[in-house]
Amino acid sequence: MSANQHAASGKKITFTEHAREAMVKRELDEESAIEAVNNPDELFLNRRTGRTVAVKRDDQALVAVYDAVNDHLEVVTVFKTSKPDKLIRRKLDKGHWVRVG
């Protein structure tokens, strides 16, 4: 997928250099990250950074963290976790994340 892939909101989705490096290192593809952004199973706001955290559940959960920047969404990192409930509970309990969807 190219950087002009659109989110469900109609906004263009781009990836930071860090996100691209993380996807290569973690053997993840853009399509999976875009799917997480477009169709998350759960959505959170990181209160520290103001970024949106999209969680897409499968065998392992894919987490895509992104910013809304003017006319586009910029994915800043992507990772998989085998323990999404533990991650989410910890972030919510510490007040780092709030559920938005």
What are the residue ranges of the model-derived segments?
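Ribonuclease/tRNase effector modules and their secretory precursors
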Residues: 1-101
